């Protein structure tokens, strides 16, 4: 369809005026459109609003200091780590890892050998990886995530 112009298409011309307030501070006119006082006060008000609306720093407590033992470091905290962390130690996940998580908390790494139902192979794995474990104070905020931390591949 071609563009058709002419009397068949009524058009209404609307004259709109745009209110403009140019700032003529250094012009040769005697009367500026915006006074210096108005310009400075509006600039000062905008700067004050920007300063007052700035975000304050968070006053949250520091995250769990031993977070590296939850899977991000070389050692695994047997009282707080998730069952999936043991997957990086061949033979531990899921059976032996599940037993460790289910039977905690432990006062020491040596308490792992007292888990009921351990067979010789599992005891051998515990001995093999004993230096990879640490038994820290159990934290209630990690208790719920021990079996299912909600991270899926």
Swiss-Prot record:
Topology of this chain in the membrane: Peripheral membrane protein
Main location, first listed in the record: plastid
Gene3D superfamilies from the UniProt entry: Photosystem II 12 kDa extrinsic protein (1.10.150.320)
GO biological process: photosynthesis; photosystem II stabilization
Listed Pfam families: PsbU
Location(s) in or outside the cell: Plastid, Chloroplast thylakoid membrane
Cellular component terms per the entry's GO annotation: chloroplast thylakoid membrane; extrinsic component of membrane; photosystem II
Keywords: Chloroplast, Electron transport, Membrane, Photosynthesis, Photosystem II, Plastid, Thylakoid, Transit peptide, Transport
Similarity field: Belongs to the PsbU family.
Post-translational modification note: Predicted to be translocated into the thylakoid lumen by the Tat system. The position of the transit peptide cleavages have not been experimentally proven.
NCBIfam families: PRK02515.1
Domain of life: Eukaryota
Subunit structure, interactors included: PSII is composed of 1 copy each of membrane proteins PsbA, PsbB, PsbC, PsbD, PsbE, PsbF, PsbH, PsbI, PsbJ, PsbK, PsbL, PsbM, PsbT, PsbX, PsbY, PsbZ, Psb30/Ycf12, at least 3 peripheral proteins of the oxygen-evolving complex and a large number of cofactors. It forms dimeric complexes. The oxyThe extrinsic subunits in red algae are PsbO (OEC33), PsbQ', cytochrome c-550 and PsbU.
Protein name: Photosystem II extrinsic protein U, chloroplastic
Function of the protein: One of the extrinsic, lumenal subunits of photosystem II (PSII). PSII is a light-driven water plastoquinone oxidoreductase, using light energy to abstract electrons from H(2)O, generating a proton gradient subsequently used for ATP formation. The extrinsic proteins stabilize the structure of photosystem II oxygen-evolving complex (OEC), the ion environment of oxygen evolution and protect the OEC against heat-induced inactivation.
InterPro entries: PSII_PsbU (IPR010527), TAT_signal (IPR006311)
């Amino acid at each position: 369809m071609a563009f058709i112009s002419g009397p068949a298409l009524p058009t209404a011309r609307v004259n709109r005026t745009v209110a403009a307030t140019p700032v003529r501070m250094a012009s040769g006119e005697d009367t500026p459109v915006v006074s210096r006082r108005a310009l400075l006060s509006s600039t000062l008000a905008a700067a004050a609003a920007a300063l007052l609306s700035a975000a304050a720093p968070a006053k949250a407590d520091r995250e769990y200091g031993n977070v590296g033992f939850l899977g991000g470091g070389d050692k695994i905290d047997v009282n707080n780590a998730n069952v999936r962390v043991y997957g990086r130690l061949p033979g531990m996940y899921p059976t032996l890892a599940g037993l460790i998580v289910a039977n905690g908390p432990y006062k020491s790494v040596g308490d792992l050998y007292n888990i009921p139902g351990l067979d010789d192979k599992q005891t051998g794995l515990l001995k093999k990886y004993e230096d990879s474990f640490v038994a820290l104070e159990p934290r209630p905020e990690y208790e719920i995530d021990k079996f299912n931390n909600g991270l899926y591949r």
